[in-house]
């Protein structure tokens, strides 16, 4: 496919600063579309422009953090911009980015990138010659970038080998020109109807079934407060007082109940 359209010889990649990152998982998932993942390897540098993410905000039943902190997911509780890497179904590593203020948990799964630098090296890592399929999907991405559990907890905004960046230079497509689509997330059973997957419309590097890809642009961040919903569900239901108690003994022709207020109870 030649030189990536978003990256030319006059382009450069600047590291993202933590101050630039939204401290909200859903907003950060959208913000990361068009940004870059870079891994500095001994054999060379590989990089890719993020074209697809999924958000797993606080209280999300589909998130690893739903039941609270454990040593395995401690990276999810770090400040926005840290790597959370897990091994999925004993087969693939997956790269996530922490998305909430330190002490709270939320994660963004990086689902797909458009390869920019080190493409031949990525093909070697994947034993794959198909550019379109090289990093389309979180497992493929991690394999192409050689990301594993040793990278869990890395500060992606610091001077580390694995980091997040933004493309700068002449002819670079600005974020405002990128049209972001939204759909439900892929491959989950809990909270499967929530629209928390974001992608660059028109990108051939986006993963998943094509039937999910709509044409409408993202209209704005949808705040889905799983924590509030969970607390509301757990709150005990208030009992009716005598003043508002429904007298179900009253009947009309046809046997239907009449909703009337009962008077004070008579002493027996």
Q: For the regions a protein language model found, what residue spans apply to each?
A:
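Conserved, well-structured core segments that form or line functional sites
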Residues: 2-240, 259-268
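Intrinsically disordered, low-complexity tandem-repeat regions
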Residues: 240-247, 252-259
